[in-house]
Amino acid sequence: MKKILLSIFFVVFLLIGSECELIDTPPGYYNLKKIDKFQQFSKIQIERNNKTIYSSSFHDLFYPDICEGTIQNIPGSLYFGRSSFPGAQESSNLMITRGTKMKYRVGNGGIPIYKINVLCIEGTLEIPEGISFFNVGALFILPGGVLNSKSSIRFTDLDPYNSKMDPFNFFPGMMVLGGSLSLIGEKKRIFQATRIDDYQLQIEDFKKIGSLTNNIYLGSKVTIYSQQISEGQTCSFSFGASNDKINLTSSSSSSLRGTNCLPISKNDKNIIVHFNCKYLLGGSSESFIDSTSTVGSSIYITGDSQVQIENFTLDSIGKTTNKLYNDTKLIFSNDKPNQVIDIIKGENQRFRNSLYIEFSNSVVIKGCAIIDRVKESRAPLIFVSSNVSLSESLIVSKSGSNLIAQYGTEFIKSKLNHYFLIPPLPQPFGLNSPINFPSPFSMDYGFEGNGIYSLSPNVQSINDTFISQLIALNFNFIGNRSIITGFDNDCYSPCTNTSILFSNLIQYPVDFKINNSTYFYKLNNNNNDNNNNTNNFNLLNINNENNNNDDNNNNNNSQNHYLLNINNNGNSPGRFFTIKDLVASDTVSAYLPNSALVFNNLNATENFSFNGTVSRLDFINSSFNTNLTSTQKFFDETTTTVTNFQNTYIYGSPETTEPPEKVFGSSITPIYYFSKSVLDSLKVETVYPNEPHKMFFNSSVSLSVKLNNMGLKTPIICIFSSNGMESKEVQYNPISTKCSFLYVSEKLGNHNIRVTIKNEYSKDSSYYFIIDFPIITVYGQSLFNAGWQMIDPTSTTIIPTPTPTSTSTSTSTSTPTTTNNNQLVNDNNNKINELDGLKFQGGCIKTLGCQLSSNAKYVGGLPNVTASSTLNSLFSWGITSDVQYDPVIIDLFINKSIATLQVQLFFTFYKPIDQYSSPLSVSIQKNPVLVMEPFAGDQPFSKNLTFVYNNTQSLDFLNISFTSRGDIYLTSLAIFSVSDSLPQIIDPITPTLLPIESVKASKPAILAIVLSIVLGSLALSIITILIVKHRKRLSQFLSKSNKDIEYAQNNEIEIKVLPKITSHSSYPSISILDTISSDSIFNNQIPKNNNRYKFKNQSLNNNNYFNNNNNNNNSNNNNSNNIIYSNCNSNYSNSNSNNNNNNNNSNSNNNSNSNSNININSNSNSNSNSNSNGNNNYQIYSNKLESFKIDEISNDTIPIINSTFPDEFQTLEFQKLAFEILKREKRLDFSFRTTNDILTCCALSDFKDFSNFPLRFNQSIITFGLINGKAKLGETYYDTLSITNDSTIRFTAFLILPMDNHSATFTSDHSSFDLGPGETFSIKFSITLHCTTRFFENFSIQINSNNIKEMYTLLKIKVESESSTRLDFNDIHFQELIEKYSWEILYRGTVGDKNALLKLIKLKTKNCEEAYRELNIISRLKHQNILPLIGCVISKDYLCLAFEYPPLGSLDYIISKKKLKMSITQKIRILIDVAKGCKFLQQSSIIQKTLRARNIFLYDTNENAEVCAKVLDLTSSKTIKGLACNNYIERVDTPINLTREISIIRDPKQNNDFNNSNNSNNNNNNNNNNNNNNNNNSNNSNNSSSLKYNIHSFAVLSYELLIDEILVGDTRKFGQEKPSIGLDKIDPNIKNFIHKCWNPIDGFTFNEILKTLKDFIESLN
């Protein structure tokens, strides 16, 4: 017999822990009790017009005091009979008292079951199988009461002589107020059948039952449901020759329906059979609940009740109809607040349904038939704020909905259910009808004819079947519902200032979970095969506004049928709606003018098309496999602002699938394919550019399409075409698997480029793919027109700006306290500076040219988001909306005579509201130019957006607005005019978006833009391309010495010579830079890197322009083997100058033969005195040549962030914590080395595309023979490059290698060589990888001759390492500080693109070996409940460990911040995972010293998930052997609650065993068998000593989780009294379990703990 559920694990908030108010009523009525159902939730006090408004109608529960005056049982009674209740008569009112356990039986004085009027249960009643009916008028389960029934229950009318009136119409029926209800039927009654013929069905499940089928279902009748008979028909039947077939009794007369059957339609694909044994005396009885009451009955469950209903039938017991709710109203006395003087009884009381459940976290309904077809009800099932699992059930109703999921019901799981609906008749809903426009106060929803009506998007529908509904799944989102619920963290609709709700900023994206559900509907009720229509995910309606805007939206008055309807209820702003894995074969319609709709993995087939209105429409990883004609288009009826295709294939011609109108922000890159078979052999992997691209006049961009050829043998060509160029054929390169084309911008304006990929030999119009690239916009040079730095004019902060002059453009800023006459922002006097007649303004001052909406909020102290201190100063202030999603509006003065303007905006993303993306929208002159662009990330970053506006109306002011959630800040704004001397722009678009990704800071116009903002300089910044003069031949310098070197070139790079670097670092660590002046080797040779630049590759196709100004380079070099590089254009990010004079004086004193100087000029003013002792081994070092980069934090600094939880994220602070990678052996080569930036700069083209390059190479990519393999760490690989001179000229060649770094060592056996005509020279390369890395680098070869200028080419190295735990420190990023201990620091951060838990351990003499040993241990820990180690980096002073970081964070965070409301089942499931992890550690001889909530991390709260929680071993653990050998425990943050366990480990009686075991291990290193034996002996010794290391900690953890509180102070100590607070409200078995674990000596082992917890789970299920 199944174990009886005895307990309630959560705090019961009804009646227990709070007193109920007693309400007196007029004579004839039951007195009432009043409680606040929402008292466990925080109240939301809303004020409007200085009045507090609050609706208590839904919060307050009034229920009749029906148990008053009942007859209580005799204490200790075991059986439910007349003798157990003294004085009980027929129709008595009875009470089973608390602590009494009774079993129902008839006879021996038992009360007849049809004579119970009222039964109240505080104890336990068990009704066994075999009872025909348990008749009762009112069944009331009070807090703590338990009813377990395997027999049927029938509700009857209340005895008028022994009852009063119930004003709220709960009874007749059942009310459960915080108790436990278990209704378990023994036999399955619902089966899916297959039609064989008109009167024969096959039931596959009967094959499993076999010959017992006849006995189980003997004498039954069947009720058959299908899409043609959604109301069902009851038939007699007999078994066929085989037990899996049933024969129906036929009749030609429909009047015999109910005893015989009409034929089954051949079009019925979904047939459900319900074996109905309800009224039969023979055969197996059915377990059901029904009603004979003349006024109806209902089941009302609340108060965190435990509910389990299986294999039961609920037959037509609901009361609430599908008309307007009409609730009972109480008229209270003015003098006595608890006295009701009159009652207006409601005619249609809400929530009196077949089954209404609220505030219950453990509800299981399985295999049930819920029938509600007597009258039009609102819904047979309604759930509010509950966790419900509904599966394998049949729900049949003549109602507004089969199921309504109200507020807070976020965890409903509907799986394998069959929903049949007789749609309601059209209601006379007019424009003024409240049912047509649901009020949030009435919750009058779900009347339309739905399968599932939900106010929560998290309702899951998996493999469900919906029959005959008007809308299978109807989702409604209401922004002001918290006024009713009181949920302080419940805001699925946007929370705006126009909503009633203010308390919560969280805006969840909506991700619908609809997997493989099926929808069938019929056009009418005529049983005609031709009238049946089957839709499998094929009609979708999404609505964003109330129905009063369009009468046609009223689904009750139309024959439209939808699988999914989404109504955003007119809320603005909108949100992201995501639909995954949808298969659509017909029209999809949406009306979401304020929202974004994303289809992910859409499979569009047959007649699919999309129509409606959405703000943003995205198709991701989708395919359109439809047969389109020239007149049929996907988007004929679509209105959208932005349309995005990402990796999406469309079958058909592009001319038939043109997307609708869109702003420039649209990413239109669909992939059209001609033949469905082509996808089996050829696919498109990547397209570049894959987003709108910006470029400047006469510049170039490399267009490319990468293909995945899976067996296509024919040659492929790619034809590039555009409105701005002639078509160009490009041969597909099978080696790079790309088609690449260098596109040169020769016209201004917007260019639509298309590539057609086809068979080279095909002469017809057939093709493989046609791809439209995103729009490419070509701009010209610009003049600064107006700007605005977002600093609060009321602030006392002064942003200084240096004086702009014609001879200096230094970007360094003055100190914050400096003032000068040319300061752009001076908030003391609100001064506006005019330079050359142009204005630059700080703050917004109406009288001086700009206006700002009053809702703008100034925010200072924004974090550094670039590598430039100047830009960081500029971006330190920003504005955002004071109310989220409220647009910030800016009116800025412009010159109306200028026709074309460029508008540049800088935004900083900082302190995200939650873990979801934050959308940004931008409009210019109220026209959208950026729509709901998602910003997301854990770290602050900056984004530059540049737009084009054509001022055709000659406006004086430009209106710019943006909206966000309040976590995106506009930090600066500038407007530029396009030069009139440039050609006319073609195809203007107003306005036009230009994202930052396409902006190259090295371009002259961007320099003008950024530096004009930074310096406030309004002077002309036209960047000219300087003509580079020919330098003297290199041979002249090699043959001469001690002679001044003259430079006539303007654009050159200074590359300084350094001694060969022998550490892993590719650039100096902070510790080196900060002490550079005291280092004689590095003195005056390493340029100061104040901005902490990181190295980054630059595009090969980008031409960099730079103007030097007054560069005086005095170099005294005493070096050898020096070379001069020239003709190399480059640029520093924060420099801009006009070259006037360039005097370079170099004096060289050489102490060796054949000496020459290396001195390549740069833009920086520098005096370099280089002294060396004649060492021939040098490498080249350069300053970083890059523009500022988003999220630039140097790898040699680690952030210290004073934050524990994500929602307490504070301003970044940085600590100079040098992380110097360990040194390795010196290189043997003496190569010239520099960074990839200089290599890219110097190499003017790839040799394969440079037809004039005279050298030929045997390979272009050095792979070291690892094309299809990966390199092992620490192993050296070799490769040879053969170079052949195909010309008639002798060349001198120089090899320039990339800089060494800690991830790899790359060397060559030669640094230079001579190569005569026809000669071949070989260079041997070697590489050694030191960590998990992808060493994809470039190296350059420069050749020189007496007859021609020097030439460059670029080759590549591509080597990837095998996976390991040794990480590349450049991939590790530190974010927020979690904990700091005496010798270790714990961070949250990332490793690559993965979230990680990062731990720094100080490596000192006393614990260095300890750390290595623990690293070795942790790397071997592989268990699903142990937080896995990603890898590590070892430096000179630190060991950095990276662990996997789970998505839900730590248990401590969830408990302390009340982030999740978990059921008892979920909590026990988490404890099981923790126990599994601890058991594994114990078996591995590891003591987890930090077992507490902060070291338990959650992955999932679904109790059916494979893994819910993992234990983090913070490497404070010690092996047992290590503890005994060292005979001490490092007490670093040792938890207080482990004191007792440590004393057990230190037990002297055990030390000898440990020491002997360890000594034995140490003395037998040469004998593996002895070692193994000794290890086993040690483990046996450990087991025999019964050390229960973490039991007490586990008890504390369990206690904290169950009571939802984190213990502090002495309450955690071992030796304290066993806990009692909160335990009196949970199951006594759980309480005993915690008490037993509280003492680790007498407690369980983890094996026993797991068994106990699994027993708890089994009892709950």
UniProtKB/Swiss-Prot annotation:
Membrane topology per the entry is:
Single-pass type I membrane protein
Task: List the transmembrane segments.
Answer: 1008-1028
Cellular component per GO, a single term: membrane
Q: Where does ATP bind?
A: 1378-1386, 1399
User: Where is region (Disordered) located?
Assistant: 802-827, 1089-1175, 1547-1584
Keyword annotations for this protein, in alphabetical order, are:
ATP-binding, Developmental protein, Membrane, Nucleotide-binding, Signal, Transmembrane, Transmembrane helix
Record-linked Pfam families: PK_Tyr_Ser-Thr
Q: Name one GO molecular function term.
A: protein kinase activity
Entry's localization field = Membrane
What SUPFAM superfamilies does the entry give? Protein kinase-like (PK-like)
PROSITE patterns (alphabetical): PROTEIN_KINASE_DOM
Please indicate the ranges of residues that lie on the Extracellular side. 21-1007
Q: What biological-process terms (Gene Ontology) are attached?
A: negative regulation of developmental process; regulation of developmental process
Q: What is its main location?
A: membrane
Description of the deletion phenotype: Cells overexpress discoidin and initiate multicellular development prematurely.
Comp. bias regions, Low complexity = 1101-1175, 1555-1584
- The Protein kinase domain sits at 1372-1661
Return the similarity comment.
In the N-terminal section; belongs to the GDT family.
Q: What does this protein do?
A: Regulates the transition between growth and differentiation.
Q: What name goes with this protein?
A: Probable inactive serine/threonine-protein kinase gdt1
Organism per entry: Dictyostelium discoideum
Gene coding for it: gdt1
